[in-house]
Amino acid sequence: MTKVYYDETVTQDALQGKKIAVIGYGSQGHAHAQNLKDNGYDVVIGLRPGRSFNKAKEDGFDVYTVSEATQQADVVMVLLPDEIQGEVYNKEIKPYLEKGNALAFAHGFNIHFSVIEPPSDVDVFLVAPKGPGHLVRRTFVEGSAVPALFGVQQDATGQARNIALSYAKGIGATRAGVIETTFKEETETDLFGEQAVLCGGVSKLIQSGFETLVEAGYQPELAYFEVLHEMKLIVDLMYEGGMENVRYSISNTAEFGDYVSGPRVITPNVKENMKKVLEDIQNGNFSRRFVEDNKNGFKEFYQLREDQHGHQIEQVGRELREMMPFIKSKSIEK
C-alpha cells in the first residue's frame, strides 16, 4: 500500500542551517519561495531580468542572477519552464554546484530524459505539488495544503530523502500528505495524463463532439454549450466526489446515456491508442520531438497552436463568453 507522509512524521532538521535558492518566480516559484520563507527557511531567488525580478523584490526576497543564487545555496530548486531548464542549468547552475549540494525539481522531465545530467556528488530530488502555484500558496495561508509527490534520483550525501521530505514540509505539503515516487514514474504518468486525457484527450473529444453537431446542422452556439461550456459542471462534480458523484447528481436520462453510449465513443481501440501514447513517452520519442522542436525555434509547436486558435469552436466561444461577463475576464488575449 502507498505510504503517505504527514507533518507529524517529518521534521525540518535536514534543512536546518541550509540556504535554498528558488530558481524562477512564476506559478510554482512564488508559492514555494513564500511558503518556505513563512516556515522559517532561508530562501533567495535566482532570476533573469524581467517582471518577476521586481515582483520577487517587492515580496521581500533577496534576488540575484541564477548563477549568484546558486553559488550561495545548499539546495537549488529549479522551477523554470521545461524547455529552458537545460540551457539555464548548463550555463548558470552547473558551473557553480559544489559537492554535497542538492539539485531539486518539481517535475522530472529534464532529469528523466537526460536533458540535464547532474554531477555524481550532488543530491537530486523532486517535490511536486499536485496543484497550481496559486492554490499551493492559498491553501498554505489558509492553514491547509495541496498534496505532493517526492522522489530521489541521486543520493550523494545519504540525506537526499530527508532533505526532500523537509522541503515538502517547508512548502506545507505534509499537512495534506506526501507520496513517494520516482522521477520516472512522476514524469511518465504526468505526461500521459496531459496528453491522453487532461489536455490532448479532452480537447479532441470536445472538438469532435462540436464538429459532429455542427456538421449535422445544429447551431454552433448550441453545440458549444452542450459539449464545452457544460464540461465544467461535470468536471467540478467529478473533482469533488469522483464519477460516482457525477452519476448521483445527473438525471437518470443522462446516466443511462453514459452507460450505453460512452463505450460506443471510447471504444477498445481508444485504449490501444492510449497505450501507444504511453509507449512514445516511455521510449523517449515524445521528449526527443519536443526538445528538437525547441532547438528549431518551436516551429511545429507554434504552427499547431495557430491551427487550433483558428478552430470554429474558439470563435464561437469568444462570442458567447461576451454574454457571460462573470467569465469574460478569464479569456486569454492572443
Curated annotation (Swiss-Prot):
Active-site residues are H107
Query: Which residue ranges does the record assign to the KARI C-terminal knotted domain?
Result: 182-327
Transmembrane intervals:
none
One GO CC term on file = cytosol
| Residues binding Mg(2+) 2, per UniProt | D190, E226, E230
Q: In this protein, which residues make up the domain named KARI N-terminal Rossmann?
A: 2-181
Binding-site residues for substrate, renumbered to this chain: S251
So which residues are the signal peptide here? none
UniProt keyword annotations, A-Z: Amino-acid biosynthesis, Branched-chain amino acid biosynthesis, Magnesium, Metal-binding, NADP, Oxidoreductase
Supply the HAMAP family for this chain. IlvC
Q: Which PANTHER family match?
A: KETOL-ACID REDUCTOISOMERASE, MITOCHONDRIAL
This chain belongs to the protein called: Ketol-acid reductoisomerase (NADP(+))
Q: Could you tell me which species this protein originates from? A: Staphylococcus epidermidis (strain ATCC 35984 / DSM 28319 / BCRC 17069 / CCUG 31568 / BM 3577 / RP62A)
